[in-house]
Curated annotation (Swiss-Prot):
One MF annotation (Gene Ontology) recorded for this entry: metal ion binding
Gene transcribed to yield this protein: rimO
Pfam family, one: Radical_SAM
Keywords: 4Fe-4S, Cytoplasm, Iron, Iron-sulfur, Metal-binding, S-adenosyl-L-methionine, Transferase
Organism whose genome encodes this protein: Legionella pneumophila (strain Lens)
Catalytic activity: L-aspartate(89)-[ribosomal protein uS12]-hydrogen + (sulfur carrier)-SH + AH2 + 2 S-adenosyl-L-methionine = 3-methylsulfanyl-L-aspartate(89)-[ribosomal protein uS12]-hydrogen + (sulfur carrier)-H + 5'-deoxyadenosine + L-methionine + A + S-adenosyl-L-homocysteine + 2 H(+)
Top EC class of this enzyme: transferase
EC number, UniProt record: 2.8.4.4
Gene Ontology BP, a term: tRNA modification
Name of the molecule in the record: Ribosomal protein uS12 methylthiotransferase RimO
Amino acid sequence: MNHKVGFVSLGCPKALVDSERIITQLKAQGYELVPTYEDAGVVVINTCGFIDSAVQESLDTIKEAMAENGRVIVTGCLGAKADVIKNACPDVLHISGAHAYEEVVNAVHQHLPPPADPFTQLIPPQGIKLTPRHYAYLKISEGCNQKCTFCIIPTMRGKLQSYPMAQILTEAKKLKQAGVKELLVISQDTSAYGVDTRYQQVEWQGKTVNTRFYDLCEQLGELGIWVRLHYVYPYPHVDDIVPLMRDGLILPYLDIPLQHANSRILKAMKRPASSENTLLRIASWREICPDITLRSTFIVGFPGETEEEFSELLAFLKEAQLDRVGCFKYSPVEGAKANDLDNPVSEDIKEERYHRFMQVQAEISRNKLKNKIGSTQTVLIDEITEDQIIARSKSDAPEIDGLVYLPKISGITVGSFAEVVITDSDDYDLYASLV
C-alpha cells in the first residue's frame, strides 16, 4: 500500500509549528512525506485564512491538489470556514480547524491506514522541523483574548491557551541539544503568556517558577543560545523584559505590533491608544538597552482613516525611528468587525499611502544601517552560496528582516557564529567582512 503523504504548509510561523507537529506524528507512524501531489496517497494542506489574499491562496492550493491528486485533507485557520472550502472544493476528504493535530492524523488514518511496523526510532527527540537546523520556532500558546476589530484570529484559533511551562522549556532544551542556535518565540499574543493559568507556579529543575512571560524569558535565557521574541502585545509588563535584553539573556530585539499612531484609529481598532505613551516607552527601552532593535507592523487605509490621521502616523514613524517596520494595506477580512465601520478607504488611496509609508521607513532604515558601518557584529550564518555567505545579525529575524552579506571564505559553516565588521549598507541589508 502507498503510505506516502503530500504536505503543504501555508501562512505564518505559528502554522508552520502546527505543520511540524502533524508531520512528526505522521513520520512516527511510518508515513513517508513526499514533495509532489502525484506520488501521494493523500495530501494534507495546512491553510491560512487571516486576510482575503491568504484565503485565495489556500483555496487555489486546495484546487490544485484536488486536480492533481483528488484525495485532500484540509486543516488550519481556513478550516474554521468549512463552508467556504466546501463551496470551492466539495469533494475534499476532511476539514478541521487550527491546531487540530489529532483530528488531522486520524483523518489520514481513515483515508490512508498507517503501515503495520512504523519506525518510531527514526524520529529525532526534538521532532521533525521544517526550518534549517540552526534555528527553530518555539510556540508557547494558542489563541488570543484580544478583540482587535481588524482581526478574526480569536474566531479561528480560539481564546488564549498557554502551553505548560515545563513542556515549553523541555522542548527548548531538546532543540538546543539538537544543534539549534536560535529560538524564535511565537504565539498569537506572546506577552499574554500565562494569563489564562493565573500565573500558576510550577517546578522546573528543582526550582519554583511562575507561568508568566517574564519567567519564561528568564528561563529560556539560561539556555545560552539566541532567544528572539515575536508578536509581543504592548502590555505594560513588557517593560520588565528589556533589562533581560540588556544583560544578554535574550536578544535585544522586540517585535511589537503597534498598528497605528492616531488615537481615534487605535480606539476603532481596539488597540492601546496613546502614541505619546508609546514614544516615552520606546525612549525608556533605548535608555535601558541602547542596542535594542525595535520591529513593528502598521496598517494603512483602515476604515475612516483621513489624510490628517495618516500624516500623524508618518510623523510618529519619523519620531520613533523604529529599526524594522512592516506595513499592510487594510484588508476587509470576512467576519472582522472593522468592516462595519463607515467611510472605507479606496484601494487607490491605500496603495498611495502604503508607498508613502514605505518611503519614509526606507529612509529611516537606510540611515540607521549606515550608522552601523565600521561596527563589529556577531552574525549567524544562514546560507553559503557559490560566491557569498548570507548571515543575520542580532537585529535580523529570518524571513522578515534584513541580511548580512559576506564574501565567501573557507572554514565557515552554516549554523555557526562569526564576528564581522560592517563595511557597507543599503536600505535594508548590511555588507561585511570577517574580523
